[in-house]
Amino acid sequence: MSNPIYKRILLKLSGEALQGDEGFGIDPSILDRMALEIKELIEMGVEVGVVLGGGNLFRGAKLAKAGMNRVVGDHMGMLATVMNGLAMRDALHRADVNAKLMSAFQLNGICDTYNWSEAIKMLREKRVVIFSAGTGSPFFTTDSAACLRGIEIEADIVLKATKVDGVYDKDPAKFADAKLYNQLTYAEVIEQELQVMDLAAFTLARDHGMPIRVFNMVKPGALKQVITGTAEGTIIS
C-alpha cells in the first residue's frame, strides 16, 4: 500500500455527488461507496474532516430568486446539509468507522454543536468529523464552509469532490475541446475566471495558503489515488 502524502484532509462533497443519477435526494449505493473510500483513508492513518453540500435536497439561492427571503432560504439549505450529514454518519457507522456529526448551530438530540477543540481531539483519535450547517451564517456557501473548517483544523489540503475530472478552461459538458489543467496558481484561477469555487471561498483559501484539489469522486478509487499522490484532478496552490 502506498503511503499517504497528506496527514489531515478536509473533504468537500457536494450534495449533487450524493444523488448519483437520481436527480434528487440521496443514492444509498453512492453513499455507501463514499463511506468505504473514506474508511480506506482512515485505515491508512489519514485524519478526515468532511463538509457536505445540500443542493441535492434544497437550493436556497434558487428560491430566493422566486421571492423567498434569502436568509430563510439559506437556513433551509443549512438544514439540508445536516440531513446529508446524518446520512453520511450512518453510512460510516455501518462501515464500522467512528464518525462524529457537528452542526454550526445547536440541534440538541440530533448532533453536536461545532466545537473546534473537540473536533481536533476527534480527528487525532482517527474519527471522521462531519461538519454540517455550512458556516452557520446565511450568504456563505458550503465551499466557504469547507475552506473555513479546513483552515481551522489545519488540514493539509481541501479536496473538492466533483462530477468532472478537475478544472477545465471551459465547460467540458458543452465543449469537446475543453482542456483539463493539472496545476494552477490562485492568481491564474482568478485571472481566467475559472469555476473552482465562489470567490469568497476561494480568496479565503488563497489568503491562508490552503491548497485545493478538484477531482472526480464518481471514479471509484479516485480519493485514494489523490491521497497517495497519483496525478488526479487539478491542484491549486
UniProtKB/Swiss-Prot annotation:
What family, per the record? Answer: Belongs to the UMP kinase family.
Stored SUPFAM superfamilies = Carbamate kinase-like
Q: In which pathway does it act?
A: Pyrimidine metabolism; CTP biosynthesis via de novo pathway; UDP from UMP (UMPK route): step 1/1
Q: Which GO terms describe its molecular function?
A: ATP binding; UMP kinase activity
Q: Name one Pfam family in it.
A: AA_kinase
Q: Which GO terms describe its biological process?
A: 'de novo' CTP biosynthetic process; UDP biosynthetic process
**Compartment(s):** Cytoplasm
What is the protein name for this chain?
Uridylate kinase
